[in-house]
Amino acid sequence: MRLLCFIALLIGISGYSQETIRIQEVTNNIVMGPFAGNRDLAFGVQNILEEIIQDRDYYLAEDAPKSIKVELLYFDVKKNSMQLAAYGRKADITQIVAGARLIVDGEIVKEVVAKGTAKSISTATLIIDDGGKFSQAGVSTALKKVCEQLINKLKL
């Protein structure tokens, strides 16, 4: 009877266990701009990926058979502005493109590419702008969007 209860307990525990996954190194393959080769950007993307994966009830483990490898491919801020007398309107669109591979037992199972954008629009009656600066909030929003799209496309 004890053996039967023990086996039933083990089956119940294994039925509720989380699936494990590992995030391999995030590589920054951006060639132009201020984020070209920036390791801080790659580290930030890895942290965002870990947060999203844990929110989806996966357990992060270094010895997991399933892993994700992410490459940052493109980063740009497109600026669009209009000025009429003293009135001005400025729109900044931050774009980030990244690719991801789902690897199971050393074999690439799926490859996806995703694009994340964040838009910042400001209007003013007098514009004093140094120009050429990136909005940290725009970059963070675009990174979060691209990471969520990668995970959704990999169907995790």
Label every model-predicted segment.
Residues 1-4:
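Positively charged n-region of N-terminal signal peptides that target proteins for export
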Residues 7-59, 78, 113-115, 126, ...:
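A structural "domain/chain start" motif
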Residues 36-47, 90-93, 129, 133-145:
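Soluble non-cytosolic domains of exported or imported proteins
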Residues 57-62, 104-110, 134-139, 149-151:
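Low-complexity, flexible helical/coil segments
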Residues 64-115, 119-133:
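Surface-exposed short loop/turn segments
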Residues 121-123, 140, 148:
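Charged, amphipathic alpha-helical segments and their flanking helix caps
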